[in-house]
Regions:
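Secretory pathway targeting signatures of secreted, lumenal, and periplasmic proteins
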Residues: 42-88
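C-terminal motif of bacterial Sec signal peptides marking the signal peptidase cleavage site
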Residues: 19-23
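Short, surface-exposed coil-to-beta transition loops
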Residues: 56-60, 133-139, 162
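Signature of long, low-cysteine stretches enriched in small and polar/charged residues
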Residues: 96-143
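Bacterial N-terminal signal peptides that target proteins for export
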Residues: 1-10
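Surface-exposed amphipathic alpha-helical segments
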Residues: 52, 147-174
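Short, hydrophobic/aromatic-rich segments at coil-to-beta transitions
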Residues: 32-38, 58-61, 115-125
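Bacterial signal peptide processing site
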Residues: 25-27
Length: 174
């Protein structure tokens, strides 16, 4: 009986240590800044400005203020690794022709890999011209759960705080 108690105590100690150690590696959910609210689904969350509305379709969510202006779109697709090795050169070869076919001229493309709050993110940024309107786009591509999400912030007027806040609050629970 003493031996069983000893074994149980050791097992509980090991389980407790594992729980503590695994908790150390887990990213903490970021705080949502004042003036922002939370977009959240089963696999992903980030902050967007209060007062903006989120409308969800079959594979896209559009988040925007009333009227025309800056906006955020969230598009999801089946989990894929095709963006993991994305470079400016591969963007220009694979994706830029699609933008041009829609009448969008893209320039100043940058691609970076970043890790906000433990999430592996590919950041794709560019300047664009469409129908005479200048736009800046920053896309954050992140895989979580069974999906790969592309969060795109489109700016008709520069708003560095919007781009920064969306990025700094991306959370997948990793």
């Amino acid at each position: 009986m003493k031996k069983l108690s000893y074994v149980m105590a050791v097992l509980l100690l090991i389980v407790g240590c594992m729980a503590v150690l695994s908790g150390c590696d887990a990213a903490k959910e970021p705080e949502i800044p004042e003036g922002y609210q939370l977009y959240k689904n089963d696999d992903l969350s980030f902050a967007y400005p209060e007062g903006w509305s989120a409308k969800t379709g079959s594979v896209v969510t559009v988040i925007n203020p009333a009227g025309v202006g800056n906006n955020i779109t969230v598009v999801y697709e089946a989990k894929t690794s095709m963006y993991d090795d994305l470079t400016v050169e591969s963007f220009n070869t694979m994706m830029k022709p699609s933008y041009e076919a829609m009448g969008m001229k893209v320039s100043n493309v940058t691609v970076e890999k970043k890790t906000p709050n433990g999430a592996d993110v590919v950041q794709l940024a560019d300047d664009a011209q469409m129908a005479g309107q200048s736009l800046a786009q920053t896309a954050y591509i992140v895989t979580s759960g069974e999906y790969t999400y592309t969060i795109t912030v489109t700016e008709m007027t520069q708003d560095d705080q919007l781009v920064t806040t969306v990025f700094e609050t991306i959370y997948t629970g990793k």
